[in-house]
Amino acid sequence: VATAAYQIEGAWNEDGKGVSIWDTFSQKKKNIKDNTNGNEACDFYHKYAEDIKMVKSLNMDVFRFSVSWSRILPEGKGKINQSGIDFYHKVIDTCLAEGLEPWLTCYHWDLPQALEDEGGWMNREIIKWFADFVEILAK
């Protein structure tokens, strides 16, 4: 089973999470026909334990999930949001407790808006920003 942070987590403005490009896009009226957004999504942020149990009940061995860059680094760089780190530790620990191998995807197209405002993927500094982010995840 594979998921993506923006599509399932919800909690778009909770516990210190910064704004991602998808948060910005989906908040603007008429960008999405029925004006829906991922503010709540399926609320994985609050229901991860029961959702992971559901994955296990499907006889899966692996759970692939992406990390919200802006949940770890609200501005895309600089200050680390410990609540974000703690959340993903709980997700990983729950996977392991359920006998699922956690497969972490570092980035699934939800760039922090603050980095997009600095040019995003067109800014050569993105290489350093991404490397710093991945280094945090590896710790």
Regions found by a protein language model. Give the residues of each.
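Substrate-binding cleft and catalytic face of glycoside hydrolase catalytic domains
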Residues: 52-139
